[in-house]
């Protein structure tokens, strides 16, 4: 089918907007590609240092036999359940490389933090900027410059965007991303959320809450809700940077190792394209479409702006909004529905979604991927024979229409994310998880300086009414733009009581957040004299996700005359002290706004 006119138009304006930086980026790639291989180009001492730690046979291959050498960048640690399976991946990949006459080295490791561990703590204020630390660590790893290809081992929220940003700065290298897959299903996400809401009301204690949380998060692999980590995997499939169909295979399955080995084969294959060529404006648009069609994480309205910039491309929220108006919602996965990602995979998974979008003219088909068979390869399901040989089978109809629907009969005719703008600035809302009767909320404001203040007001019973909770001083420059996911249970309790409730903030919410209408990423942020600094208790605020507006219903003269508030001195000082936050002062000081991707490296 012909490409949808809106996709064509959005892609064309991104191409035009990005002409100068993209040309400079590609010129840099061409210059890097024309050089001799590292082991031939570097001095003898450099080469000796580079390969001194290798087994003897590998040294012979890479130096004397001029074998191709893969650089592995790993985000392994066993703090993250999603990354624990990565521990032994380098050994598997090295073995597979040797089978094909090549070598592989762990070029370096990057940090990986778990937002589930740091939610509601000072550590969460390092979260967003850890993406750029990961990008820098990826660049440091690859800066040894003795690699002919690269493999990126990572899964979670900031890790994949950080690895991708770093890899794009070495965009002349063929690069494949290697995931670990989701943990098997435990306590359902809906049941877990109900226990959290009961705990917020004091109806259950710590022991029962811990039991529920441990039953939900019970083993190795990605969390099973469709948050930022699993959205990462969907977007990598849509961009053709995975082995096809590898996103949601559980860590314990035999198929998982077969796919991991195939990543090494793919990156060594003759003609595997450089990642900087794969990630062009068409691939970025494909990722945006996949995000919208699945109701993915709002965090990617920040992260993929940064990813695009790393490839010399400029996108903005208007591009997302234009696409959202024509991209249908095809998936209902928690928090957008009851199913988890294992049920999503069983119903047809990413391959089903990509096939439906391609057939509807809602994705670019003329793109490069790490598969020689192009993007259509990602519409098939991998299977392994007894001898571990891989093949890919066609995906039929959705096996569960409560989870996945065809483009001709979607859950919604439009995407799961919306742009909001008005006299409070520009922000975004994830509507796919919000009941339709809550898409418009108009109520008096209650202004908070911290999420702890909101929690205290809830516990004191001060919010048992229609209310729009404004939580400010949560932007990139204020305190690193933490996720405020801990606010979901109390706000959900208020909504469950029948009150019309919404959140407005310059901070972020987790990819797992939903249910309660939340205007997030509001920019300019309050610390930059953004409009949220003018809001006062009692101002009536209207959040309208139908019309795409976000306004304080205050007359223009009064609004203009208000002097923007400043954060309390005590809070301003506390935000930068302790728990390593001092080390990120330069990041906060230099960060642009959320819509610019909060890219501290520009």
PLM regions and their residue ranges:
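Catalytic or ion-coupling anion/metal-binding cores of large enzyme and transporter domains
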Residues: 1-68, 74-78, 82, 91-110, ...
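N-terminal small/polar loop signature for handling phosphorylated ligands or for N-terminal nucleophile
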Residues: 107-145
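A short, small-residue-rich loop immediately preceding and capping a beta-strand
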Residues: 141-163, 174-178
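Acidic/charged coordination and interface sites in well-structured regions
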Residues: 88
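Contiguous domain-boundary segments centered on the initiation and propagation of an alpha-helix
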Residues: 131-138, 145-150, 455-456, 462-466
């Amino acid at each position: 089918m012909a490409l949808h006119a809106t996709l064509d138009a959005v892609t064309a304006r991104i191409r035009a907007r990005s002409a100068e930086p993209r040309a400079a980026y590609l010129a840099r790639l061409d210059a890097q590609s024309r050089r001799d291989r590292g082991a031939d180009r570097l001095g003898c001492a450099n080469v000796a240092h580079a390969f001194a730690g290798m087994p003897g046979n590998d040294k012979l291959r890479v130096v004397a036999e001029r074998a191709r050498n893969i650089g592995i960048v790993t985000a392994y640690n066993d703090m993250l359940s999603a990354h624990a399976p990565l521990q032994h991946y380098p050994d598997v990949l090295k073995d597979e490389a040797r089978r094909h006459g090549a070598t592989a080295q762990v070029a370096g490791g990057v940090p990986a933090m778990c937002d589930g561990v740091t939610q509601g703590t000072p550590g969460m204020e390092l979260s967003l900027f850890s993406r750029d630390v990961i990008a820098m660590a990826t660049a440091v790893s690859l800066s040894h410059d003795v690699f002919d290809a690269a493999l990126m081992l990572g899964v979670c929220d900031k890790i994949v965007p950080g690895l991708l940003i770093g890899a794009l700065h070495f965009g002349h290298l063929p690069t494949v991303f290697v995931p670990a897959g989701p943990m098997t299903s435990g306590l359902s996400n809906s049941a877990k959320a109900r226990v959290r809401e009961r705990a917020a009301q004091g109806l259950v204690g710590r022991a029962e809450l811990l039991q529920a949380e441990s039953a939900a998060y019970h083993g190795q692999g990605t969390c099973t809700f469709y948050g930022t980590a699993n959205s990462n995997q969907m977007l990598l499939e849509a961009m053709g940077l995975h082995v096809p169909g590898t996103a949601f295979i559980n860590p314990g399955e035999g198929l998982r190792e077969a796919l991991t080995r195939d990543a090494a084969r793919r990156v060594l294959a003759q003609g595997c394209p450089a990642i900087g060529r794969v990630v062009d404006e068409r691939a970025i648009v494909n990722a945006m479409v996949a995000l919208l069609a699945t109701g993915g994480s709002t965090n990617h309205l920040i992260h993929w702006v940064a990813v695009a910039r790393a490839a010399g491309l400029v996108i903005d929220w208007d591009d997302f909004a234009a696409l959202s108006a024509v991209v249908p919602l095809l998936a209902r996965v928690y928090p957008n529905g009851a199913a988890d990602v294992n049920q999503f995979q069983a119903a047809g998974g990413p391959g089903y979604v990509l096939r439906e979008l391609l057939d509807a003219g809602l994705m670019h088909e003329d793109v490069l991927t790490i598969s020689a068979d192009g993007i259509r390869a990602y519409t098939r399901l991998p299977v392994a024979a007894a001898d571990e040989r891989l093949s890919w089978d066609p995906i039929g109809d959705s096996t569960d229409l409560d989870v996945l629907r065809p483009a001709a009969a979607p859950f919604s005719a439009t995407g799961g994310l919306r742009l909001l703008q008005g006299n409070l600035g520009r922000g975004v809302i994830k509507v796919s998880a919000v009941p339709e009767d809550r898409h418009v909320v108009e109520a008096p404001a209650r202004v908070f300086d911290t999420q702890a203040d909101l929690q205290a007001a809830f516990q004191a019973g001060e919010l048992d009414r229609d209310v729009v909770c404004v939580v400010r001083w949560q932007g990139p420059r204020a305190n690193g733009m933490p996720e405020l996911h801990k606010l979901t249970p109390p706000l959900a309790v208020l909504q469950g009581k029948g009150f019309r409730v919404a959140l407005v903030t310059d901070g972020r919410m987790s990819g797992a957040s939903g249910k309660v209408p939340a205007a997030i990423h509001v920019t300019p942020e309050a610390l930059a004299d953004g409009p949220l600094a003018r809001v006062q208790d009692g101002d009536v605020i209207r959040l309208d996700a139908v019309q795409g507006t976000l306004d304080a219903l205050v007359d223009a003269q009064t609004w203009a005359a208000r002097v923007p508030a400043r954060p309390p001195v005590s809070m301003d000082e506390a935000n930068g002290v302790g728990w390593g936050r001092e080390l990120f002062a330069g990041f906060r000081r230099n960060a642009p706004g959320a819509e610019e991707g909060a890219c501290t490296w520009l």
